[in-house]
Each structure stands twice: as structure tokens, then as C-alpha cells.
Design a protein with these regions (language model features):
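Short, well-structured beta-strand segments enriched in hydrophobic/aromatic residues
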Residues: 3, 41-58, 156-180
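Extracellular/lumenal ectodomain signal focusing on beta-strand-rich modules
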Residues: 14, 42, 70, 111, ...
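A short, structured loop/turn motif at beta-sheet edges
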Residues: 40-47, 75-79, 116, 152-161, ...
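Short beta-strands within extracellular/lumenal beta-sheet-rich domains
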Residues: 1, 36-38, 102-113, 147-150
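Aromatic-lined ligand-binding clefts that engage carbohydrates, nucleic acids, or primary amines
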Residues: 1-19, 50, 111-137, 143-144, ...
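Glycine/proline-rich low-complexity spacer/linker segments in large multi-domain proteins
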Residues: 22, 55-84, 167-217
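Edge strands and adjacent loops of beta-rich recognition modules
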Residues: 81-110
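Short beta-strand segments within Ig-like beta-sandwich modules, predominantly Fibronectin type-III
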Residues: 26-30, 139-144
Length: 224
């Protein structure tokens, strides 16, 4: 429950969910202000039917719509199923952890015990814009470019929480996920594949921190 539908021109559409009329009163927007959100009735367990009616002609461009809410998604071939949300993720692709279409930021936390030291963090295998690193809630820097290392000065003896905030991208949210050729360029025709260059299955890109960051500890007594 408490889900939203994000869609362009929402106020001009006729929308029903399981034969129940959806009030198209705008209550927000998603990513871009042209993609507006409306509240959906409760989504029931099992098969649900969402119908969107709009005036359609030769010059009409239809765009994707998005169901937003506190839930996870499982993709299998051509099908996607809403599942319980995954509140804990590991260092691997988010597409296999209930977040195949997620394009926002993700926070990873790990606890360590250190002596008085400095540390070097290496996170060289991720798919996103950059990683922000925090120690005990204090921002220490970002990892974005090779060699993907960050020095943390003056860590005191004791327990610390290291947080990695991955800034995501929208490749699995707005990208051409049915384009078999997967070209390296992006333009209008990237979303217009047809024939044997189009498939019903989702062709997803890995996102997230894909391998555990390495934390190197150097005791201050050895760094004279």
C-alpha cells in the first residue's frame, strides 16, 4: 500500500487499478518535474491490472510509467514481480537483490575495530557515479577516479562505523532495457529498437558496489 504511479501528463489520463478509478490529483514528481505522481489504491497479493487510457494519434509519444513504493522487485525473463523490500544489501549487483530498476543512492555500512592509525580504503569495482565515504558519520572524501583509493587520517583506537554511499545512476530506470544490440551511444533511436534487435526480456546493467572495499590499516607507530 501507499504506492504511487509516476507518469507524464497524469492529469490528462484515465487510470484504473483492478477496476478501481485512480484519482489523478498530482501529489509530487519523480526525477523530472514532467513525470508527475498520483496515489494508487492498495496493490493486492496476486495478479493486478493497471490500465492507462490516453488520447493516441500519429504524433503521440508514449513514455514509461513507474510504480513507486516501499517494496522490492524480482525479475525473471519477461516478468517482474513486486516482493517484500530488501532492507539489507551486500556488495554485489543490486539487480539481484530486489532492486533491479532502482536508480537512487545506496548506503552500505560496516563496523571495524582499529588501533591508533590511518587507513587507506580501496573500492575499485562499482557501478555508479561515485562513492562517498563517512567514518562515524563524518564525511571523509569521495572515490570516483582511478586508482579508487582514499586515505583516512587519524583514526583513534576503538570501534568505528565506515559508511559507503554509492551515488547511483538511472541506466536501469530510463535506459534501453530491451535493446539487444546494446550500443555504446545514446540517442533517440536507442529506445526504438525493433525486429530481432528488440526482446521482451529485461537486459539489465549491474549497479552498486560490486566487490567488498578493502580497508588497509597502518598503525601510527609504524608511520614515523
Amino acid at each position: 500500500k501507499d504506492a504511487f504511479l509516476a507518469i507524464e501528463d497524469a492529469e490528462k489520463l484515465q487510470i484504473t487499478l483492478n477496476n478501481e478509478t485512480v484519482c489523478n490529483e498530482i501529489n509530487g514528481w519523480y526525477v523530472d518535474k514532467s513525470i508527475k505522481t498520483v496515489s494508487l489504491p492498495e496493490i493486492k497479493k496476486g495478479l493486478n491490472e493497471l490500465i492507462v487510457k490516453l488520447p493516441f494519434g500519429k504524433r503521440t509519444n508514449t513514455e514509461w510509467c513507474y510504480i513507486l513504493g516501499d517494496f522490492g522487485v524480482k525479475t525473471e525473463g519477461c516478468f517482474s514481480t513486486i516482493i517484500e523490500p530488501n532492507t539489507h544489501v551486500g556488495f554485489s549487483s543490486l539487480t539481484n537483490q530486489g532492486l533491479p530498476f532502482y536508480g537512487g543512492n545506496v548506503s552500505y555500512k560496516t563496523n571495524i575495530h582499529t588501533p591508533d592509525c590511518y587507513a587507506i580504503i580501496c573500492a575499485n569495482y562499482f557501478r555508479g557515479a561515485l562513492i562517498k565515504v563517512l567514518v562515524d558519520g563524518e564525511e571523509k572524501g569521495i572515490i570516483a577516479f582511478a586508482p579508487y583509493r582514499l586515505k583516512i587520517d587519524e583514526m583513534t583506537k576503538g570501534n568505528h562505523t565506515i559508511e559507503f554511499i554509492l551515488y547511483g545512476n538511472r541506466i536501469n530506470t530510463f535506459g534501453g532495457m530491451h535493446n539487444i544490440s546494446q550500443p555504446k551511444w545514446v540517442g533517440p533511436n536507442f529506445w526504438r529498437s525493433e525486429g530481432d534487435q528488440w526482446c521482451y526480456e529485461y537486459i539489465l546493467k549491474d549497479t552498486g558496489i560490486l566487490a567488498s572495499p578493502i580497508i588497509e590499516i597502518y598503525e601510527n607507530s609504524t608511520n614515523k
